[in-house]
Amino acid sequence: MTELLKTPIHPLYAKYGAKTIDFGGWDLPVQFAGIKAEHEAVRTDAGLFDVSHMGEILVKGPDSTSYLQYLLTNDIEKIKIGKAQYNIMCYETGGTVDDLVVYKKSETEYILVVNAANTDKDFEWMVKNIRGDVSVTNVSSEYGQLALQGPSAEKILAKLTDVDLSSISFFGFVEDADVAGVKTIISRSGYTGEDGFEIYMPSADAGKVFEAILAEGVAPIGLGARDTLRLEAVLALYGQELSKDITPLEAGLNFAVKLKKEADFIGKEALIKQKEAGLNRKLVGIELIERGIPRHDYPVFLNEEEIGIVTSGTQSPTLGTNIGLALIDTAYTEIGQEVEVGIRNKKIKAKIVPTPFYKRAK
């Protein structure tokens, strides 16, 4: 059996009562105090996530921008230095290699932050499709990454840094920012639907920053609450809402797919065809009317006919209802449409509802 990978924060998990699981080959905390309490901490105050398992890929060179324009669906030329952009990497078929965030450090240097389980696959795909004068380097092992999320995130982080955090706009970032005596990159971003920051630092210093933030009275948060938070906010998870068989258009990520950008990109032709022909299926929100929790890969029925599958589901700690995302036949995606979810050989009533399930007050 292959030994599980560990983040630089791993030695501290036991001290804070973490219960760990195998997550894509990594030994990561599923919870600390408990999923519901952790979820509520992030929605009402703040919580700290160890996301050091995420991958970082450095792209450098005079042709970096044109290379990324070819590789990614969003318009890279629109990113200013010091800003980040959500992006999708597609196959020729229009299916998804990964979803990721691109940070623009300079006109010739970018960092791509990718899903942990996809890091090697993404890196190989990027190298295989290299064009122009660029270098592509997997620098994942050099970085620790923490996410401080919640309405109190700015107030808490302000105690540990001299950076004027209020000047960092959403998806903006600052380099060489001192946090608890460590040089970091602070990005105003996250995966929870709340305000917050993602902080990148050298791996060796990650534990120091982690403990300095927790010392401010912040709760450590595990993967369980990370999933319920992102699901309420309807943020896609690769392997569930996106995959090699699911295009970003089917997943409702049109805002990150710029079919009109001049640059050709991998998958552009297939995505244009799909859009012109009309989508056969699309991602919708569902809420269960009867008791039961929808889970990944559960079938969705209408009048005995299978019309789709659940991609993600949970009991929503914020709403107190059982919710899910489902990829279903476009003909049946109207709000209010009643469907059934197959749960343990029973068909449980559900209805299609507007998304996101949760949106924070600005």
Swiss-Prot record:
Keywords: Aminotransferase, Transferase. It comes from the Bacteria. The keyword Magnesium does not apply. One of its GO terms (biological process) is glycine decarboxylation via glycine cleavage system. Its EC number is 2.1.2.10. GO terms for cellular component: cytosol; glycine cleavage complex. It catalyses: N(6)-[(R)-S(8)-aminomethyldihydrolipoyl]-L-lysyl-[protein] + (6S)-5,6,7,8-tetrahydrofolate = N(6)-[(R)-dihydrolipoyl]-L-lysyl-[protein] + (6R)-5,10-methylene-5,6,7,8-tetrahydrofolate + NH4(+). It holds the Pfam family GCV_T_C. GO terms for molecular function: aminomethyltransferase activity; transaminase activity. InterPro entries: GCS_T, GCS_T_bac, GCST_C, GCV_T_N, GcvT/YgfZ/DmdA, GcvT/YgfZ_C, TrmE/GcvT_dom1. The keyword Transferase applies. Disulfide bonds: none annotated. It is an enzyme of class 2 (transferase). The glycine cleavage system catalyzes the degradation of glycine. PANTHER family: AMINOMETHYLTRANSFERASE, AMINOMETHYLTRANSFERASE, MITOCHONDRIAL. The glycine cleavage system is composed of four proteins: P, T, L and H. Belongs to the GcvT family. This is Aminomethyltransferase. It comes from Listeria monocytogenes serotype 4b (strain F2365). The lineage of its organism: Bacteria, Bacillati, Bacillota, Bacilli, Bacillales.
